[in-house]
């Protein structure tokens, strides 16, 4: 591809209605874009392909929750404390910058995970200046990326626009577990808007302040080492870029199957499964194998909730390797935190192979009440969640977490009870595949773009407009017939563009530019025998078919069940 491929794609995207800067008549704002008619159709098809994999094939449940959540949710999840980026600004022009990204761009170093103090030292050591005006950069501070607001008038309850869709799933775990017949593993998905007040978004649609996430939260028993259906994607060959290779001076990507990566201990079965699934999905969208890799997060860049995380990255001409999917092992972090903060028991239950003796603290409310007042019920609930295999573990007092604070509970506030149990409660672990739909959409545009012809060559099923319908000439009889064909195809469920403006060659060129895979032309012969021609975008070859068979033929072509050469009589 040529160096200006991003500009070429975005010029077509703006001109033809894929992607538009938002608020243009008021000067726009970084990090916000609109999808035009073609972009909205393309985005919907990407989302439906994602649903095909996760809802239909995996059988996961889908929910829809509010975009605005109460503050307690994010205090429990750790986002209020940890969802921060390092920020600096120019003391002269006032422009703001994300400090680690600025250091990486200007110095070519890896600044991910550096503390504000370390970044401050780096900036001063190399005398980094404002890239906009050359002014001096101010102190590096921490900036929370969540948009906050008040819920209700005056000083209402604090709320946040969600920075991820996941939290609503975790806080509904009790009902979701019940709907899953209390069996693990099970998955829950959500597609929706997420919001991050990025400090200085400068990469077009790659870094947005409002974007669409498609996330799955897959709950499983950590004692079960095998993931059901693992064989489905076990033989997918991926390019792995683990931590060890990243830390080498000349580290390399390791090409191997998901099965081999699991056998070598590089990834767990659940993570490997979803890496393989994601690669296959991206292939279906026209992203080639050589442009896809799976990179493991370094410890310093890992999110506060993750024990391991792998990004599926796609190679782009301007931006290099860009994360489009993150697959994180969130362990039991979220369920445990929400249990501690809410007082609700968000555990699952497993049967034991043999009964066993356990010891647990039974709260003594007449001691807890006077000592802890209004916190006593939550402390009692936290005590009831504790079990031990020996009585000695519970003697001498206990420490529990309530509302994010550790509370020391003296031994007189509980009695030690011995029980014989046939099962036990535990916090399920969670694997989270999180897809950035907007980034995937741009990757689809770039990797299906033909720079020589200046057209998009989407897979037929993915094209926003599936069929163009044209009269050969702008004669009333041909126009009327072509409009009837277009209406019939729309009623059959196809996305159709009717066009009778300009020469037939110009109409084909306009359709090719936006990736229309098949164009139907009504000509003189149509008026005589009710046949039309179908033109293939990529070969420009044409076949003639009967109008009565047109919908079935097009459906076979778009679904990949019919070869073009077999679709009709060659013209």
Swiss-Prot record:
CDD domains: GlyRS-like_core, GlyRS_anticodon. It is found in: Cytoplasm. GO terms for cellular component: cytoplasm. InterPro entries: aa-tRNA-synt_IIb (IPR002314), aa-tRNA-synth_II (IPR006195), aa-tRNA-synth_II/BPL/LPL (IPR045864), Anticodon-bd (IPR004154), Anticodon-bd_dom_sf (IPR036621), Gly-tRNA_synthase/POLG2 (IPR027031), Gly_tRNA_ligase_arc (IPR022960), GlyRS-like_core (IPR033731). It is an enzyme of class 6 (ligase). Keywords: Aminoacyl-tRNA synthetase, ATP-binding, Cytoplasm, Ligase, Nucleotide-binding, Protein biosynthesis. PANTHER family: GLYCINE--TRNA LIGASE, GLYCYL-TRNA SYNTHETASE/DNA POLYMERASE SUBUNIT GAMMA-2. This is Glycine--tRNA ligase. The gene is glyS.
């Amino acid at each position: 591809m040529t160096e200006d491929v991003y500009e070429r794609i975005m010029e077509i995207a703006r001109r033809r209605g894929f992607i538009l800067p938002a608020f243009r008549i008021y000067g726009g704002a970084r990090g916000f874009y609109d999808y035009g008619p073609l972009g909205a159709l393309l985005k919907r098809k990407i989302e439906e392909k994602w649903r095909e994999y996760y809802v239909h094939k995996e059988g996961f449940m889908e929910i829809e929750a509010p975009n605005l959540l109460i503050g307690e949710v994010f205090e429990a999840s750790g986002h209020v404390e940890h969802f921060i980026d390092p920020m600096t600004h120019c003391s002269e022009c006032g422009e703001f910058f994300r400090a680690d990204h600025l250091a990486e761009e200007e110095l070519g170093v890896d600044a991910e995970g550096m503390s504000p103090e370390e970044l401050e030292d780096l900036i001063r050591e190399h005398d980094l200046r404002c890239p906009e005006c050359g002014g001096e950069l101010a102190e590096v501070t921490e900036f929370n990326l969540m948009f906050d607001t008040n819920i209700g008038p005056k000083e209402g309850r604090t709320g946040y626009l969600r920075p991820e869709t996941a939290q609503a799933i975790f806080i509904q775990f009790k009902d979701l577990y019940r709907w899953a017949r209390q069996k693990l593993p099970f998955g829950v998905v959500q597609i929706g808007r997420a919001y991050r007040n990025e400090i200085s978004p400068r990469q077009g649609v790659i870094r947005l302040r409002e974007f669409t996430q498609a996330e799955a939260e897959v709950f499983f028993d950590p004692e079960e080492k095998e993931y059901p259906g693992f064989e489905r994607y076990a033989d997918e060959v991926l390019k792995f870029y683990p931590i060890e290779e990243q830390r080498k001076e000349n580290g390399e990507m390791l090409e191997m199957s998901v099965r081999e990566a699991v056998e070598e201990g590089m990834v767990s079965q659940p993570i490997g499964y979803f890496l393989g699934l994601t690669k296959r999905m991206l292939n279906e969208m026209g992203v080639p194998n050589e442009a896809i890799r799976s990179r493991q997060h370094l410890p310093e860049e890992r999110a506060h909730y993750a024990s391991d995380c792998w990004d599926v990255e796609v190679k782009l001409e301007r931006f290099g390797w860009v994360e489009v999917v993150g697959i994180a092992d969130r362990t039991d972090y979220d369920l445990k935190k929400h249990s501690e903060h809410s007082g609700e028991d968000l555990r699952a239950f497993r049967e034991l192979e043999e009964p066993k003796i356990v010891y647990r603290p039974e709260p003594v409310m007449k001691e807890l009440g006077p000592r802890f007042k209004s916190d006593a019920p939550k402390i009692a609930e936290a005590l009831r969640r504790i079990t031990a295999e020996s009585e000695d573990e519970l003697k001498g007092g206990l420490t529990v977490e309530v509302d994010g604070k550790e509370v020391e509970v003296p031994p007189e506030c509980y009695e030690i009870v011995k029980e014989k149990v046939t099962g036990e409660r535990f916090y399920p672990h969670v694997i989270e595949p999180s897809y950035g739909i907007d980034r995937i959409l741009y990757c689809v545009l770039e990797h299906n773009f033909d720079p020589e012809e200046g057209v998009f060559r989407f897979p037929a099923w993915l094209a926003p407009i599936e069929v163009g319908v044209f009269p050969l000439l702008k004669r009333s009889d041909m126009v009327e017939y072509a409009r009837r064909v277009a209406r019939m195809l729309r009623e059959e469920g196809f996305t159709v563009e009717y066009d009778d403006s300009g020469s037939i060659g110009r109409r084909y060129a306009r359709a090719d530019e936006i990736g229309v895979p098949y164009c139907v032309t009504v000509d003189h012969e149509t008026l005589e025998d009710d046949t039309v021609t179908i033109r293939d975008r990529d070969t420009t070859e044409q076949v003639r078919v009967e109008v009565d068979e047109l919908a079935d033929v097009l459906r076979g072509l778009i679904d990949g069940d019919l070869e073009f050469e077999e679709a009709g009589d060659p013209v």
